[in-house]
A protein has these predicted regions:
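Pre-Walker A (Motif I) flank of P-loop NTPase domains
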Residues: 1-2
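Hydrophobic anchor at the beta1->P-loop junction of P-loop NTPases
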Residues: 5
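The conserved Walker
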Residues: 9
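Conserved glycine(s) of the Walker
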Residues: 12
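Hydrophobic positions on the alpha1 helix immediately C-terminal to the Walker A/P-loop
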Residues: 16
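P-loop NTPase switch/communication element
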Residues: 22-66
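Conserved P-loop NTPase nucleotide-binding/switch module
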Residues: 72-133, 141
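Conserved small/polar residues in nucleotide/adenosyl-binding loops
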Residues: 162-165
């Protein structure tokens, strides 16, 4: 199952990825790809099969996603989909690899359009539009509110299933 957690910056999307990652079976290889090590899969899930990749100027998200597919993963977790790397993530997910990622949008229904806008060219967008709906199983919107006492709480608002199988 591929999950995309969305919401505004600082809302707790990565924390949700960390929470749901504990339900990945321990014998399934997970590859995390991040620029800032936030998921810390090996810390939050000790003893599970994990390879943590850190991207930089010489080893970008596209390189990491391509390299990860050679390592026989069951899961690819991208800390945040921001730009053209989403193309490679979708291609990876289309091979049957499962995954989780986060992205910034204020409505779960905007996930497909947000992904299309991240792609470099209109040709990529046209070619990958169906892949988005095939690859994404669940979209989750995270919100936060303050209660009367001024305490902040976070909650999951709508959940969207793109297809049921």
């Amino acid at each position: 199952m591929n999950l995309i957690f969305c919401g505004m910056p600082g809302i707790g999307k990565t924390e949700c990825v960390k929470f749901f990652s504990q339900y990945v079976p321990g014998n399934e290889r997970v590859i995390t790809i991040e620029d800032t090590m936030e998921i810390r899969y090996s810390v939050t899930n000790p003893g599970k099969d994990c390879i943590e990749m850190r991207v930089n100027d010489r080893f970008d998200y596209a390189d990491a996603i391509k390299a990860s597919l050679r390592l026989n993963p069951k899961w690819i977790m991208l800390s945040e989909a921001r730009s053209k790397e989403v193309k490679y993530l979708l291609e990876g997910w289309s091979t049957g690899v499962r995954g989780m990622t986060t992205l910034h949008t204020d409505d779960v229904r905007n996930i497909p359009d947000r992904i299309l806008n991240m792609l470099e060219t209109r040709v990529d967008a046209d070619r990958l539009e169906n892949d988005i709906y095939q690859a994404m199983d669940v979209g989750v919107l995270i919100r936060k509110k303050k209660n009367g006492a001024g305490q902040v709480y976070r909650y999951i608002d709508p959940v969207s299933y793109t297809h049921l199988t």
